[in-house]
Amino acid sequence: MLKNEKKALQMFCEEDAWRDVFKEPFINEADNGRLMAAEGHIMIRVEPSLLRCKYKQGTQRLPNYDFERNDINKVIRFADIETAYNKFDLIPEKKSKDGMSDDCPECDGSGEVEYEYVDSEGHTHYKDCDCPICDGTGKRDDYELVETGRMILPKDCTFSMDGQIFDARLLWRIVEAVRLMGFDSITWLSKQFGANIFRVCDGVTVLAMSRMEQGEHHQYVELTPSTPPTP
């Protein structure tokens, strides 16, 4: 069984995602009842026999990858990732003071609202114009960020591992989630068309998309996975 099951699995999702399938874990009827939790760049699949909690039902076609293929078979220890993580120049985490988005509530961040005008002959006319509340910026004037006390990775950090480039924040999110489940490493099974498949334990697999390039202004740290000893 997985420790801290609900909390750990939710870490693979985005509660404010634009697609419902990325908001919370669900039992995927298109995957033989396995649980799926994803946010678009990372995903976890869990066999139903390992689950203790209840989840909603859903249907989502899986990407066309072979989740059983194992042609890399290298162990990635979380202690090594943490050592690499600490080499980055971290920045203070900031969050909205009131917990709300910085989007203007009148125009939902678009910067435009629709005006209606009825002329002297009774005809109605519509026109999109700058929102009068935010002056077309789409942002709140009273939005304020405050530091949480945590130090986090900036957006431009990457891990490089055997030629694959990973968004460091996403890989670290996987580490934090899988640690909550009670594990201290994952096994890298395969890389397939930009996707990387990892095994947490029997019945639990993780998918993480790699990046095409590191970018011009970035920090990166090399990770060296290890080959497990032959039984």
Each model region followed by its residue ranges:
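DNA polymerase processivity clamps
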Residues: 1-231
